[in-house]
Swiss-Prot record:
It catalyses: an N-acylsphing-4-enine + H2O = sphing-4-enine + a fatty acid. Keywords: Calcium, Hydrolase, Lipid metabolism, Membrane, Metal-binding, Transmembrane, Transmembrane helix, Zinc. It comes from Drosophila melanogaster (Fruit fly). It is a multi-pass membrane protein. The lineage of its organism: Eukaryota, Metazoa, Ecdysozoa, Arthropoda, Hexapoda. The gene is bwa. Hydrolyzes the sphingolipid ceramide into sphingosine and free fatty acid. This is Alkaline ceramidase. Its cofactor is Zn(2+).
Length: 283
């Protein structure tokens, strides 16, 4: 029995090492491997995640008021974006299966956290009974289930993420039809445009790699990282605005830009014109 147990443990260690091994992921992007550095598989794809690391701390600062008077959960999302960046850097540096899973799961948890906080109640399923805490528990259980499935069948991740991203953009379009603030509407148009450019980069890198490599530019996945971060965080800012407008209108949300409010290509954030008392039991 002891020998069998030891053998089983060795098998587990061997499997874990296989998943950690560089190149163990079935996914390989267009950029050539180990061309710039002998220690980093995809150099450009690795360091093009810089916005995921640099900008969330700024967003945490800008959303300090929002976190105090609307929901502190907004800061969880900004921290999760850092996790996405670090996971993506690890994946592209190693092309390991564990890196791929960490990258995809971090994105999944950003979606679930955002849905928990900002998903409009009018789209809730009936059994949730219009209760955000119940819906948040549903999202948590869904995230745990999807995480388990992803380790069992990694291919599940791609389908889950695609299933969530397209309806999110459709929902953004629907919400934009309801807003009266033209600054918010313009940000929505810019976010959607950047998202479309990001998807264009992803598809071209994945499907037309040979064509882009023929002109010595196999770096579109790196641009995907930059554009998708801009699209993702601006969409999150928009849904943070929609949430207050819909459920806490007395707070009077206002879209602003940093460092100069008049410059609409700065960093957007939500200011609260009528803070009132800090909320205690907000998810």
């Amino acid at each position: 029995m002891g020998g069998m147990g030891g053998g089983g443990l060795l098998d587990i260690y061997a499997m874990a090492w296989e998943h950690l091994r560089p190149g163990s992921s079935p996914v390989d992007w267009c950029e050539g491997n180990y061309l710039i550095s002998s220690n980093i598989a995809e150099f450009v794809n690795t360091f093009s995640n810089f916005l995921f690391i640099l900008l969330p701390p700024v967003l945490i600062m800008l959303f300090k008021e929002y976190g105090r008077f609307v929901t502190p959960g907004i800061h969880v999302i900004w921290v999760l974006l850092i996790v996405v960046g670090l996971s993506s850097m690890y994946f592209h540096a190693t092309l390991s299966l564990i890196g791929q899973l960490l990258d995809e799961l971090a994105i999944l948890w950003v979606f679930m956290a955002a849905f928990s906080l900002f998903y409009p109640k009018r789209y809730y399923p009936k059994f949730v009974k219009n209760d955000r805490k119940t819906f948040s528990w549903l999202m948590l259980l869904s995230a745990i289930a999807a995480t388990g499935l992803s380790w069992w069948k990694p291919i599940v991740n791609a389908f889950v993420l695609m299933f969530m991203s397209v309806p999110t953009m459709v929902m953004l379009y629907t919400e934009l039809q309801r807003v009266s603030d033209q600054r918010v509407y313009r940000l929505g148009i810019r976010s959607t445009t950047v998202w479309a450019v990001a998807v264009f980069c992803w598809i071209n890198d994945r499907i037309f790699c040979e064509a882009w490599s023929s002109i010595n530019f196999p770096y579109l996945h790196g641009f995907w990282h930059i554009f998708i971060f801009i699209a993702a965080y601006t969409v999150l800012v928009l849904f943070a605005y929609f949430y207050v407008e819909s459920e806490l209108p007395q707070r009077q949300p206002l879209l602003k830009y940093w460092p100069k409010n008049e410059f609409e290509f700065g960093i957007p954030f939500i200011s609260i014109r009528n803070p009132g008392k800090a909320l205690r039991n907000t998810i």
